[in-house]
UniProtKB/Swiss-Prot annotation:
The lineage of its organism: Eukaryota, Metazoa, Chordata, Craniata, Vertebrata. Expressed by the skin glands. It holds the Pfam family Bombinin. The keyword Signal applies. GO terms for biological process: defense response to bacterium; defense response to fungus; killing of cells of another organism. Belongs to the bombinin family. The modification Asparagine amide is found at residue 70. This is Maximins 6/H10. It comes from Bombina maxima (Giant fire-bellied toad).
Length: 144
């Protein structure tokens, strides 16, 4: 009788343990499903906010580019445009991370070329503008 009692109790304990494991697995899978759904919702909201922010920044960058294209840019304006371009590259890299490094390298090379051209331009235009301003100043003194 003791043996039958021990077997019955062992069977009850094993079945209770199996049920608890099964319930744990079900609750974990339900929790995983709920977590996945909430992550999808968060990603959807984040994606919508990111796209809205990107479009707003692109509009701002276009507006600033048009403004600066029509007038002379100061050094501060140039820095602002560089920062905006960097932000736009960062935002684009969020959409396409595999292309980000390629674009960054390409942008660096273009920026390096532009800087060299600007340095050469300054070396040539600086003395020429100085001569023109001296000549105009001399003409104004003679007329006045």
């Amino acid at each position: 009788m003791n043996f039958k009692y021990i077997v019955a109790v062992s069977f009850l304990i094993a079945s209770a343990y199996a049920r608890s494991v099964k319930n744990d697995e079900q609750s974990l899978s339900q929790r995983d499903v709920l977590d996945e759904e909430s992550l999808r919702e968060i990603r959807g909201i984040g994606g919508a906010l990111l796209s809205a922010g990107k479009s707003a920044l692109k509009g701002l960058a276009k507006g600033l580019a048009e403004h600066f294209a029509n007038g002379k840019r100061t050094a501060e304006d140039h820095e602002v445009m560089k920062r905006l371009e960097a932000v736009m590259r960062d935002l684009d890299s969020l959409d396409h991370p595999e292309e980000a490094s390629e674009r960054e390298t390409r942008g660096f090379n273009q920026e390096e070329i532009a800087n060299r051209f600007t340095k050469k331009e300054k070396r040539i235009l600086g003395p020429v503008l100085g001569l023109v301003s001296n000549a105009l100043g001399g003409l104004l003194k003679n007329l006045g």
